[in-house]
């Protein structure tokens, strides 16, 4: 049974919901799945004033956790078209894993959230994928077998590089049914790929 980690950072809960959907898809494909988040770097008082979602249930990950998994799916909200500082700070600590080749050949994937439709979804996915490729991971995206990406009747997230959602500038838009379907589909593909590689 493949072991999958869904590792995320979420300020307002949008990525948390996407992480849960990815985990659901991976479990549905027979994987053992853990959801963990990276540490918050914003001081608690400031985070409260900014209305960050501080009651997230996922445990905090450590860098040492990563090598226990066959697949790691990394998600974060976008900051100016790139990875959040919280996720970057966590991934920047993986140098020891890189030196030992501890993640070489494992499965990696990315998911993201932006405030607007053109707010840097693909560049954020690429900034995650770049880290994963430097760690030697095999990347699984979100292919067009997810029919929701072809939807032209509403604004939807999703790219061939990974599942995404759009939060709106004030955070009022929650992941849509199509966004969550894409996340589940990507989770399923990650789990199936890891199972083929690791049994």
From Swiss-Prot:
Q: What EC number(s) does its UniProt record assign? A: 1.6.5.2
| UniProt-listed InterPro entries | Flavodoxin/NO_synth, Flavoprotein-like_sf, Flavoprotein_WrbA-like, FMN_Rdtase-like_dom, NQO
Where does this protein hold FMN?
A: 10-15, 78-80, 113-119, 134
State a single Pfam family of this protein. Answer: FMN_red
Instruction: Domain (Flavodoxin-like): give its ranges.
Output: 4-190
**Cofactor(s) needed for function:** FMN
Per the record, the domain of life is: Bacteria
Q: Which UniProt keywords apply?
A: Flavoprotein, FMN, NAD, NADP, Nucleotide-binding, Oxidoreductase
Reactions mediated catalytically: a quinone + NADH + H(+) = a quinol + NAD(+); a quinone + NADPH + H(+) = a quinol + NADP(+)
User: Which residues take part in binding substrate?
Assistant: 98
The answer to keyword NADP applying to this record is yes
Describe cofactor binding as the record notes it: Binds 1 FMN per monomer.
GO molecular function list: flavin adenine dinucleotide binding; FMN binding; NAD binding; NADH:ubiquinone reductase (non-electrogenic) activity; NADP binding; NADPH dehydrogenase (quinone) activity
Q: Where does NAD(+) bind?
A: 12
Cystine pairings recorded for this chain: none
**One GO term of the cellular component aspect?**
membrane
What sort of enzyme, by top EC class, is this?
A: oxidoreductase
What PANTHER family would the database entry show?
A: FLAVODOXIN-RELATED PROTEIN WRBA-RELATED, FLAVOPROTEIN-LIKE PROTEIN YCP4-RELATED
As for family, the record states: Belongs to the WrbA family.
According to UniProt, the name of this protein is NAD(P)H dehydrogenase (quinone)
Q: Which organism is it from?
A: Paraburkholderia phymatum (strain DSM 17167 / CIP 108236 / LMG 21445 / STM815)
């Amino acid at each position: 049974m493949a072991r999958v980690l869904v590792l995320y950072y979420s300020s307002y809960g949008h990525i948390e919901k996407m992480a849960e959907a990815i985990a659901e898809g991976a479990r549905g494909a027979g994987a053992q799945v853990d959801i963990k988040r990276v540490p918050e770097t914003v001081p608690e008082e400031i985070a409260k004033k900014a209305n960050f979602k501080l009651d997230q249930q996922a445990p905090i990950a450590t860098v040492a956790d990563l090598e226990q998994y066959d697949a790691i799916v990394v998600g974060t909200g976008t900051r100016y078209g790139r990875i959040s500082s919280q996720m970057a700070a966590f991934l920047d600590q993986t140098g020891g894993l890189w030196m030992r080749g501890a993640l070489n050949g494992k499965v990696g994937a990315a998911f993201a959230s932006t405030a607007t439709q053109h707010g840097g979804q693909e560049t954020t996915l690429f900034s995650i994928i770049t880290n994963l490729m430097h760690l030697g991971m095999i990347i699984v995206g979100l292919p067009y077998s997810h029919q929701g990406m072809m939807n032209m009747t509403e604004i939807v997230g999703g790219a061939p590089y990974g599942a995404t959602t759009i939060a709106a500038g004030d955070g009022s838009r929650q992941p849509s049914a199509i966004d969550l379907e894409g996340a589940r589909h990507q989770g399923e593909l990650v789990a199936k790929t890891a199972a083929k590689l690791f049994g």
